[in-house]
């Protein structure tokens, strides 16, 4: 079985492409079924394994397969599933086999590959991805072991390095940008659209600035109300957004919608109603919640996750010593995992050897039983049984020795000597 990771992320693709390749949560289980049955094939010698990790910053397919053409087939599957031409998608895709796939998984879970260096949210997202794959019946020995090791490595990295210390989060970056637009965030009305973890983080940071008003709009009213109450804010129905958008100076959106929920026309009307007072908008969703054309409006300052990346990277530069320490830990753990993987590669061979040897044993025992049944001398039967088993068991090695030449033969001879140098001694020879 070969490990392979196929994906795109914030390093390789802009948000405009990432949002087209993202998997909504409800699509992941059925996607895994097609990925296994159509791409990897139901007739594979070993059952294929797969998991899909889809976040704002990355979409990745982790798989274990016997298919030697897995790389190209995976890219084609991803292209077909999302109806994106291969020529458009392929330049942004990375394909990581074996140890590279292992190293990547360890780095992602440890926060080393995140836009926010050392952030912890990705670890929870990865655990959710593994849970979903398990529920879909898509995991097996190889990926289960990979992800168990991955989570252990992430815990070790975060527990022994300062990789997460003083990190500049996306939420903190959003506040910093708002402070560039408005002299005082405390004078502004802030609207949060959504009620997930990212919005909760943003609300925490903005609430610390003491805004004039804090409002949460969410599709599920009860969840939005709970979040608003935590920050002494108010909740409003998401359906009220078009009519009330002009009330807010700062709008932060991060929902799971597959289509934009804020269109150009609605923002144009809001700007006009505000008499061209500026609106600061942050779209942290992938796919995006706000139509990108909104950024062209004169009095609107629209930022996406990619735009916030520059501010985040400023904070990342100061923690390179922790990065080096984390990378060293990861490299050691990658080598450990590859040793385990190497031992797994011989398991099918050992299993086959046992099966073949047992088939020979049963065949010769059956012959011996027939000989005994017709009254043959038991000692002669045992001798015939042992001779037949000996001849059959050494037939494969002797045939191999006769077939090979040169250096290969010398190596095989040394190998065989090692196998048979500790031949058991008979009872008579041992003196018992």
From Swiss-Prot:
Entry annotation: catalytic residues: 56
GO MF, one example: NADP binding
Catalysed conversion reaction: (S)-4-amino-5-oxopentanoate + tRNA(Glu) + NADP(+) = L-glutamyl-tRNA(Glu) + NADPH + H(+)
Record bears the keyword Oxidoreductase: yes
Pfam families: GlutR_dimer (PF00745), GlutR_N (PF05201), Shikimate_DH (PF01488)
Highest taxon of source: Bacteria
Sites where the protein binds NADP(+): 194-199
GO biological process, one term: protoporphyrinogen IX biosynthetic process from glutamate
Pathway: Porphyrin-containing compound metabolism; protoporphyrin-IX biosynthesis; 5-aminolevulinate from L-glutamyl-tRNA(Glu): step 1/2
InterPro entries: 4pyrrol_synth_GluRdtase (IPR000343), 4pyrrol_synth_GluRdtase_dimer (IPR015896), 4pyrrol_synth_GluRdtase_N (IPR015895), GluRdtase_CS (IPR018214), GluRdtase_dimer_dom_sf (IPR036453), GluRdtase_N_sf (IPR036343), NAD(P)-bd_dom_sf (IPR036291), Shikm_DH/Glu-tRNA_Rdtase (IPR006151)
Binding site for substrate: 55-58, 114, 119-121, 125
Keywords tagged on the record: NADP, Oxidoreductase, Porphyrin biosynthesis
EC number per UniProt: 1.2.1.70
Site entry (Important for activity), positions: 104
Comment block on domains: Possesses an unusual extended V-shaped dimeric structure with each monomer consisting of three distinct domains arranged along a curved 'spinal' alpha-helix. The N-terminal catalytic domain specifically recognizes the glutamate moiety of the substrate. The second domain is the NADPH-binding domain, and the third C-terminal domain is responsible for dimerization.
Family assignment from sequence similarity: Belongs to the glutamyl-tRNA reductase family.
Function comment: Catalyzes the NADPH-dependent reduction of glutamyl-tRNA(Glu) to glutamate 1-semialdehyde (GSA).
Misc note: During catalysis, the active site Cys acts as a nucleophile attacking the alpha-carbonyl group of tRNA-bound glutamate with the formation of a thioester intermediate between enzyme and glutamate, and the concomitant release of tRNA(Glu). The thioester intermediate is finally reduced by direct hydride transfer from NADPH, to form the product GSA.
Subunit note: Homodimer.
Protein name: Glutamyl-tRNA reductase
